[in-house]
Amino acid sequence: MKKNQSIDLLHGPIFKSLSLLAIPIMATYFIQMAYNLVDMLWIGFLGSGAVASVGVSGNFMYLANGLVNMPKIGSQALVGQSLGANNKKETKNYIEAAFQSSILFALIYGIIIIVFQKNLIQLFNLKDSTIIQDAQNYLWITCGFIIFSFVNQIFTGILTAAGHSKNTFIATTTGLVLNLILDPVLIFVCNLRVIGAALATIIAQIIVTLVFLYDAKKLDLFQEIKLLSKPDKNHISKILKIGFPPSIQSMLFTCISMYIARLISSFGAISVAVQKVGSQIESISWMAADGFSASINAFTSQNYGAKNYNRVHKGYKTGMLVVGLWGLLTSCILIFLPGPIFSCFIHESDILPYGIDYLIILGFSQLFMCIEIATQGAFNGLGKTLPPSIVSIVFTSARIPMAIVLSHFLGVNGIWWAISISSIIKGTVLVTWFILYSKRRLIA
């Protein structure tokens, strides 16, 4: 396959198409995970105060990711559908609308962060003045220049929808490698500490944007795009209508996770450490599922736009088979080999039993979490983002009362069971919903 040739999602073997599209996406996720671990390692050398300041500021990055999901997910579905229908004019209109709306969101969000940075950090009731100042500096730099991150997300969504996931892998990997190099240089050599970490992130994001722009010049997909043209309210509204539910879902998930983290911290530092390490181990499961979900999304949107409904059904079944087998494998590994796995990350014998409990309990839900993620991709590809958002918001919110009640009887394990049970329910409900929906609406 030539470098800038897209993967044909409308014809040929389905498994091959899905895999070729998913592999670069999954590789990007795993590189991102490795970067996050190394990044936290460098910041950790500055002390717990620096880690706390970056952690607090990071919450607003998560909220920003939820915001950019609105134009990203909406445009990914509609660009994919218009490509499948071979409607070049609509494809162009949706791409322009996606970039224009995301840039507007980024400017508004960045201005709010810069103006209210002090007030926003005060929400976390930090006591140490150094930590507060570091948090404010990290916040206004990373979120004040969030426009590059937003533009990169839109490029990623559109290129994936068009079958160009290899391009996104190259661009993102370039940024991650650069970030790995810049972190120690700016943090320690230039002695910029937390500010250095923030600058490394922004510089890397700018480079990623430049790589995307370089690629865009060579792709027919972007040849007639005019970002300075008058915004088309009709196309923007269609994008935002589809992207709004998952955007709210993402931001609420962040808020719920923050509350759950507070519950976990009430059981002491060991529980916090177990959750941090355990979630990194568990991410191997959902990252692979996320990669195939993005692949299923693009495959579904293009074939839905081309009215290849039978191929949509077959694509979903193929994707679910792959993701289901992966989820089953990770469930078995976490349930039957928790000790050897967790001991690779934490060696203290007093912590290991808690880590084993975490992996076993979460192991029961891996299969269901994977099929939920994959099914969300299929729904999003159809432009029907409301069902997965409803299921996620309702049952993720249920984690809070479940965690409070179960932890009263089971200790911190009750929180793990609340997370696992809710994932099992979400996977079961969403898959059932999609099967019923596709039988009624997707008739070949």
Protein language model features and the residues they cover:
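Small-residue-rich hydrophobic transmembrane alpha-helices
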Residues: V51-I111, S149-T168, A261, V274-P338, ...
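Residue-level hotspots within the lipid-embedded alpha helices of multi-pass solute transporters
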Residues: Y29-M33, G66, A106, G110, ...
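Short runs within selected transmembrane alpha-helices of multi-pass transporters and secretion channels
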Residues: K72, I141-T160, T168-N179, A197-F212, ...
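Short alpha-helical transmembrane segments in multi-pass integral membrane proteins
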Residues: M1-A22, V79-F145, V189-F244, T300-S365, ...
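Transmembrane helical elements of multi-pass membrane transporters/channels
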Residues: L20-D39, I141, N152, G175, ...
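Residue-level signal for short hydrophobic patches within transmembrane helices
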Residues: H11, F15-A34, V38, F60-L67, ...
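Helix-terminus/linker motif at the lipid-water interface of multi-pass membrane proteins
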Residues: F30, A34-A52, I121-S129, V185-L192, ...
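Interfacial/gating helices of multi-pass transporter permease domains
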Residues: I43-Y62, Y94, S129-D134, V194-I195, ...
